[in-house]
């Protein structure tokens, strides 16, 4: 008798994705972040739905409605801070997930990797429009500064900015449309996640050794469901610790002041997870150049499969590239720190050095290291 989960069409899809899925037997905890991102997305959609029930997307009442959620709605403060800190957890998992993909050479699964880049950009767009919604000082000025970057596009730039604003400045029309975008984008992300998984299950997962694992596969359930469950509990513990003890540690104090177009904050900066890209943007004195560098800082991920010339998948047996990888990680930490600092000496020069080294490591040094490692391997073959 065939198992019930192999008969019904919908159950068969679930079965082949999460139960009987053949999985490499040696994947480490670095492979947990995919499922954690799924949990983060679910938390964000659920908390966001409950917030949307009480939020009003009008410049006159947006700030007050967020205050009302925190003060008057049952557990509104909990939902609001789960949503705000859930976004931070989302990006922590996202950075670790991408970092693992680079370290273990998962970018060689081209379709999965490219859909992943589209997902990354969509999540960044969602987080940006979401940050505008509380209509605090940093929300307003962040929206003004970032949308204004589009004016650097030759010829159509200024018209495009006014079209996005829905007027001649960030105002009621902007807030309403940003709320609409923020509501719809998570569902687009969910659809993209399904496509991401579809392409992943076409090829099967990569593994730490970088070797073909077809001869050594185990079913996803119960082995990896239990393993993922442990990751979920750790994620929820960290998230609840943040929410209950330090809910505002990752936020900006300026956002507790209602938006005022007549008063500019001393230092306009985005949320911490955008600071690395913001630092790259600020390190170039030219406006259009800065915008291009900002876009390239993310799109450069698409160059990894093209620049890869190594005979091995992953960095496990590649000591030179490993050193470069950790240089890149340290570089991103420095960029994140610089993005939050004022535009003055010595921060500007540090930001410029870090920006140049970010692109140099990926485009010049890593391919050179791969060539050296290939030649060393030839000697010892």
Swiss-Prot record:
It is a multi-pass membrane protein. GO terms for cellular component: mitochondrial inner membrane; respiratory chain complex III. It holds the Pfam family Cytochrom_B_C. PROSITE patterns: CYTB_CTER, CYTB_NTER. Heme b b562 binds at residues 83, 182. Component of the ubiquinol-cytochrome c reductase complex (complex III or cytochrome b-c1 complex) that is part of the mitochondrial respiratory chain. The b-c1 complex mediates electron transfer from ubiquinol to cytochrome c. Contributes to the generation of a proton gradient across the mitochondrial membrane that is then used for ATP synthesis. The chain crosses the membrane at residues 33-53, 77-98, 113-133, 178-198, 226-246, 288-308, 320-340, 347-367. Belongs to the cytochrome b family. The cytochrome bc1 complex contains 11 subunits: 3 respiratory subunits (MT-CYB, CYC1 and UQCRFS1), 2 core proteins (UQCRC1 and UQCRC2) and 6 low-molecular weight proteins (UQCRH/QCR6, UQCRB/QCR7, UQCRQ/QCR8, UQCR10/QCR9, UQCR11/QCR10 and a cleavage product of UQCRFS1). This cytochrome bc1 complex then forms a dimer. This is Cytochrome b. A ubiquinone binds at residue 201. Binds 2 heme b groups non-covalently. Keywords: Electron transport, Heme, Iron, Membrane, Metal-binding, Mitochondrion, Mitochondrion inner membrane, Respiratory chain, Transmembrane, Transmembrane helix, Transport, Ubiquinone. It comes from Sigmodon hispidus (Hispid cotton rat). Heme b b566 binds at residues 97, 196. InterPro entries: Cyt_b/b6_C (IPR005798), Cyt_b/b6_C_sf (IPR036150), Cyt_b/b6_N (IPR005797), Cytb/b6-like_sf (IPR027387), Cytochrome_b (IPR030689), Cytochrome_b_C_euk/bac (IPR048260), Cytochrome_b_N_euk/bac (IPR048259), Di-haem_cyt_TM (IPR016174). GO terms for biological process: mitochondrial electron transport, ubiquinol to cytochrome c. Heme 1 (or BL or b562) is low-potential and absorbs at about 562 nm, and heme 2 (or BH or b566) is high-potential and absorbs at about 566 nm. One of its GO terms (molecular function) is metal ion binding. The keyword Metal-binding applies. It is found in: Mitochondrion inner membrane.
């Amino acid at each position: 008798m065939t198992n019930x989960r192999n008969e019904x069409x919908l159950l068969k899809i679930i079965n082949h994705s999460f139960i009987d899925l053949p999985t490499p037997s040696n994947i480490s905890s670095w492979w947990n972040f995919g499922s954690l991102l799924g949990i983060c997305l679910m938390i964000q959609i659920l908390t966001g739905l409950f917030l949307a029930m009480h939020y009003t997307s009008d410049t006159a009442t947006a700030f007050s409605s967020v205050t009302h959620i925190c003060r008057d709605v049952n557990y509104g403060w909990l939902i609001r801070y789960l949503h705000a800190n859930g976004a931070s957890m989302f990006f922590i998992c996202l950075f670790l997930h991408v970092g693992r993909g680079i370290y273990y050479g998962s970018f060689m699964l081209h379709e999965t990797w490219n859909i992943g880049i589209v997902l990354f950009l969509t999540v960044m767009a969602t987080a940006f429009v979401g940050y505008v919604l509380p209509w605090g000082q940093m929300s307003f000025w962040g929206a003004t500064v970032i949308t204004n970057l589009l004016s650097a596009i030759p010829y159509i730039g200024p018209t495009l900015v006014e079209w996005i604003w829905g007027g001649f400045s960030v105002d009621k029309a902007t807030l309403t449309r940003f709320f609409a975008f923020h509501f719809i984008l998570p569902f687009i992300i969910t659809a993209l996640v399904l496509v991401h998984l579809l392409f992943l299950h076409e090829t099967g997962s990569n593994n730490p050794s970088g070797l073909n694992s077809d001869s050594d596969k185990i079913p996803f359930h119960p082995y990896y469901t239990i393993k993922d469950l442990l990751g979920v509990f750790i994620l929820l513990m960290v998230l609840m610790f943040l929410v209950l003890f330090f809910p505002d540690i990752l936020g900006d104090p300026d956002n507790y002041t209602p938006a005022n177009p007549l008063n500019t904050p001393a230092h306009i900066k985005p949320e911490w997870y955008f600071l690395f890209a913001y630092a790259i943007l600020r390190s170039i004195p030219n406006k259009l150049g800065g915008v291009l560098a900002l876009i390239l800082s993310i799109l450069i991920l698409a160059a990894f499969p093209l620049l890869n010339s190594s005979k091995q998948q992953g960095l496990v047996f590649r000591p030179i590239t490993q050193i470069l990888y950790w240089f890149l990680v340290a570089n991103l930490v420095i960029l994140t720190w610089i993005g939050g600092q004022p535009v003055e000496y010595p921060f500007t020069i540090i930001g410029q050095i870090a920006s140049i080294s970010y692109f140099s490591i990926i485009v010049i040094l890593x391919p050179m290291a791969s060539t050296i490692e290939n030649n060393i391997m030839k000697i010892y073959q």
